[in-house]
């Protein structure tokens, strides 16, 4: 085989993404992925060489797509409330589609090499970030949201959005609910968060 098939490569990548981050099977083997994709294990090695390389690629792909959406969220022509609504939507959609992506990320935060990999390709737009902080302060001054440091506001927002997703297995067991019920709860989080954040 000398010519790579883009369709097959995408099939393997999408299958790996589902197994690793939708099903939470972080230790799945190339044989597991091949079986789920309906291809020979040799093809998985042909396209990605190893299970670890495939894992790293699909994780990076998911992370990059998430940050790209966040960058689009802070476009200046949108109102502050719309930006926050979009941020919640983006986070919730990813959390429902790939519930174990954030879980894996949190589990690796004490690994210096992983932290370096997470940040080395992430070039923040300082001007855009500063403008967003300025918007937060303006909303506080207008009385739309509670006054605090902008970073505290963002931390509160991140916690309210991500906590249920990261704690999903525990919450499902503690509340005696299934995946369908949990997704309904998550779907209602947006309105609950907006009511908590905005004073008017």
PLM region spans:
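Short alpha-helical scaffolding segments that buttress acidic/His motifs in well-ordered protein cores
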Residues: 88-91, 104-109, 157, 161, ...
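All-alpha amphipathic helical-bundle segments outside canonical DNA-binding/catalytic cores
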Residues: 82, 120-123, 140-158
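Short, basic, alpha-helical segments at the C-terminal edge of helix-turn-helix-like DNA-binding modules
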Residues: 60-65
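N-terminal intrinsically disordered/low-complexity leader segments
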Residues: 1-7, 18
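Hydrophobic alpha-helical connector segments
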Residues: 72-100, 150-154
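Helix-turn-helix
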Residues: 11, 15, 19-53, 57
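C-terminal peripheral helix-coil segments that are non-catalytic and often amphipathic
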Residues: 130-142, 160-200
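Short secondary-structure transition hinges
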Residues: 92-131, 152, 178-184
